[in-house]
């Protein structure tokens, strides 16, 4: 009777208010104490109360389930008061590995049209020659493109077509920081190969206003979808604890680790 009263007699068909789906719960046993979320699956006087309690990772995944990466709170906007030209020069230095940054810059082809045996490719981070080195095409210019089956000249502003690609390590840092977690172990920041991993985008007007809004660089998916994709591709698994500390471990490292 007492247990049923603590869950507002939700087994009764005549209750006025619908019971809460989840409730905070504290599990204690001697000095052991953990806080989680209790979910009641069924209640009856015959079988009692059937429930489950989620801890740590399950609570984290539940909180992030429907959160879009583009809508993460606190996403930075990188502003260059000097304008588009200065921002483009900075990204050019990043492309040449002269300046460390939270992103990489390199050319990718995002589209191509062929008209009368002439190809008209479209690039993010288009490159031209600057004397003996490669340089980003960063000035205002006229480009020839295919529109409705015809080749036409289009005038584009300075910085058009230039867009950095966010490092996966930085995206992970922004995810955990947004929800108050400290990321204490991140192989995407320390492993030589994984530290080069980025998320591509095809946003041609990223820097034309003289700033970089990181929302435009984020993939169009939820946090959970992003983390699941990382696990499928790299075996990276997230572990969190009640102290709001997070660790990312690779499956291969977990399998090969010596038990402590």
Each predicted region: which residue ranges?
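Polar, S/T/G-rich
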Residues: 1-233, 240-243, 247, 253-257
């Amino acid at each position: 009777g007492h247990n049923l009263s603590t869950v507002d007699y939700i087994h009764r068909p005549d209750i006025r208010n619908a019971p809460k789906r989840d409730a905070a719960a504290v599990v204690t046993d001697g000095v052991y104490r953990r806080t989680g979320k209790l979910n009641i699956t069924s209640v009856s006087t015959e079988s009692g109360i059937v429930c489950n309690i989620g801890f740590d990772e399950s609570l984290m995944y539940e909180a992030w389930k429907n959160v879009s990466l583009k809508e993460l709170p606190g996403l930075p906007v990188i502003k260059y008061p000097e304008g588009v030209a200065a921002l483009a020069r900075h990204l050019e230095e990043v492309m040449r590995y002269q300046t460390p940054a939270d992103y990489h810059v390199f050319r990718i082809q995002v589209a191509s049209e062929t008209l009368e045996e002439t190809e008209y490719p479209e690039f993010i981070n288009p490159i031209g020659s600057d004397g003996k080195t490669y340089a980003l095409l960063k000035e205002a210019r006229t480009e020839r493109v295919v529109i409705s089956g015809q080749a036409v000249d289009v005038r584009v502003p300075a910085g058009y077509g230039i867009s950095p690609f966010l490092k996966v390590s930085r995206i992970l840092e922004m995810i955990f920081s947004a929800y108050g977690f400290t990321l204490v172990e991140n192989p995407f920041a320390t492993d030589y190969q994984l530290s080069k991993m980025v998320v591509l985008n095809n946003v041609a007007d990223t820097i034309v206003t003289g700033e970089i809004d990181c929302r435009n660089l984020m993939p169009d998916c939820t946090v959970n979808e992003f983390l699941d994709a990382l696990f499928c591709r790299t075996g990276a698994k997230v572990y969190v604890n009640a102290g709001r500390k997070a660790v990312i471990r690779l499956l291969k490292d977990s399998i090969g680790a010596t038990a402590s």
